[in-house]
């Protein structure tokens, strides 16, 4: 019930942004309501000196003395989700330019955003979302307009901050390659309610019996293997949060470049029950690429066709669906 409420709240916030485009941020922003698409009334604070130092090192064009922190560090959602008005799921960006555009053009259908998006000029002033990339085959980031002249970005697992439109350029995000505005097609509230109902039905909660079955399978793994895996996992998770190449990344695939991932992958299929056990905690959804890299049976992997409503679920629900599939079909 709690998750359904969160989803509906998310829809309500993004519906306001897409349909009414009203100012819902701080009155201190003196924002133009016609330009503001802030997804929710957000907290604002001044970054600490340590945060300023880190951000300045990794984003040299960022004026850290003129930014605000609008959201604390969390791995629950990323920049792509936030730019679509979603804060309860992580949505990996499509790497290829055209596929990335399709994500936004079909944001309502694919992810449950309250509206789809249309392309607009990257040079104009009417854009509400910018898509970033280092090239047409490496799309990396999404930022959203916050107020007149100010933009907002969720930086991977890290903070959500305000910034001038192009201040994150010449970094791992590359530069702005495409811009969007909310689709002018009116959103029917009845459609939103129906979509919310559909997503609630798709939401997975593993039963106690399923969880125990996973725990039992993991308990059968050799202690030395388990210790090695846990040590590598903890080291990997820590590295993700401090390495600039992963700390700010909106794609869980970026985490696969770290040496700990390679070491865990080399441990082979024996660690799959341990991966499943970790996935019982939905915050560990970023383990999915490791499972996909190790699992050789395609029937035990979750994949989607374009337009599949299950894409709505995000990485967290996909992780739970993967656990359930593995339990139902695995002979291990």
Model feature map: region roles:
Residues 54-108:
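Cysteine-nucleophile protease catalytic domains, especially the papain-like/related folds used
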Residues 97-159:
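...with weaker cross-activation on analogous glycine-rich loops/strands in unrelated enzymes
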Residues 19-22:
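Bacterial signal peptide processing site
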Residues 27-44:
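Post-signal peptide N-terminal segment of mature Sec-exported envelope proteins
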Residues 2-8:
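Sec-dependent signal peptide recognition
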Residues 136-138, 142-190, 321-328:
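Active-site or metal-binding loop neighborhoods of secreted/extracellular toxin and effector enzymes
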Residues 14-17:
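C-terminal motif of bacterial Sec signal peptides marking the signal peptidase cleavage site
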Residues 188-332:
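Extended repeat-based scaffolds of very large eukaryotic assembly and lipid-transport proteins
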